[in-house]
Each structure stands twice: as structure tokens, then as C-alpha cells.
């Protein structure tokens, strides 16, 4: 699957209304809310052979993109050290920080697949939370959802006939 197709399917299937993106720049932690994750923020990578070696979309920001997001309104919410103070990997720590900032209790890890909803609901808006370096989606997951939806549509169509 090409990057463009993977992005198109991800956007089509996503249960999120918007995204909270986080990144570390010069040891400071920033976050910004966006409607879509821009293609230039994503790279196609392969997971390790230990994890199956599957292709995936990965959220990656270089310093120029981080500087651009800061100019566009990313706000400093802490430091890189703050991420390390919270148990779990940096991505989980970032999610927990976002939950706490919004007065909510964190959900269990990976409790909802990305096409079913966001990571957090704030004022009725479902947000996916991603820290720089996070996996966005594996291509095989996109293929699985595509098959599920195709089968559901065929079942619904047969019921109409």
C-alpha cells in the first residue's frame, strides 16, 4: 500500500474528530490541536521483525516541522523530564498528562481501536493523542478494517434485497 492510500484510509476510518499532537523541542514539551495529521508529519516504516515486520504509518517530526508548529500555536506544557516522571513509555506518559490537564482519568491502554473513537473526549470532541515517534496505524489494520466494512456493507445490501 502506498503512503497516500494509507493516509486516505486512515482518515476515512478514523473515529477521531481531531488530534492532539505532542513533541519535545529543546527539552521542552509542546502540544497542539489539529484537525488532521498532515502527510508531511507521517512516514512509512516497518515494525521490527520481532513485531512482525509490518509496514506502518509513523508520526515523525523533524526540527523544522517542530519550529513550524510552535509558530502556528503549539503551547509549552512541560519539559522532557516531566514525561520521564510518569510511569510508562513517553507516549503513555504524554496521554496521561493530557488526561490530567483535562481533569479526566486515563483509559486503559489501547482500550479503543482508532476507528471506534478517540483516546480522549473533551467537550464532545473525540481526540487521538500522538507524541512524536508514535505509531499511527499498521497497514494490515487498515486492510482488516476495509474487509470488515466491505463485509458489513454486503450483508446490509443482501438484507435490502
What are these regions (language model features)?
Residues 1, 113-126:
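Short acidic loop-to-beta-strand element that houses the catalytic metal-binding Asp/Glu
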Residues 20-21, 31-33, 121, 126-128:
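A structural signal for short, well-ordered beta-strand segments and their strand-loop junctions
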Amino acid at each position: 500500500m502506498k503512503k497516500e492510500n494509507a493516509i486516505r484510509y486512515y482518515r476515512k476510518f478514523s473515529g477521531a474528530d481531531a488530534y492532539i499532537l505532542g513533541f519535545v523541542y529543546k527539552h521542552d514539551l509542546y502540544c497542539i490541536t489539529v484537525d488532521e495529521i498532515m502527510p508531511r508529519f507521517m512516514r512509512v516504516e516497518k515494525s521490527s521483525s520481532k513485531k512482525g515486520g509490518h509496514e506502518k504509518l509513523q508520526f515523525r517530526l523533524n526540527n523544522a516541522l517542530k519550529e513550524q508548529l510552535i509558530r502556528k500555536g503549539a503551547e509549552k506544557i512541560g519539559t522532557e523530564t516531566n514525561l520521564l516522571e510518569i510511569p510508562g513509555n513517553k507516549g503513555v506518559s504524554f496521554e496521561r498528562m493530557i488526561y490530567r490537564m483535562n481533569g479526566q482519568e486515563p483509559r486503559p491502554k489501547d482500550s479503543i481501536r482508532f476507528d471506534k473513537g478517540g483516546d480522549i473526549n473533551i467537550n464532545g470532541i473525540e481526540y487521538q493523542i500522538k507524541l512524536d515517534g508514535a505509531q499511527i496505524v499498521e497497514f494490515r489494520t487498515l486492510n482488516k478494517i476495509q474487509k470488515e466494512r466491505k463485509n458489513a456493507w454486503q450483508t446490509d445490501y443482501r438484507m435490502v434485497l
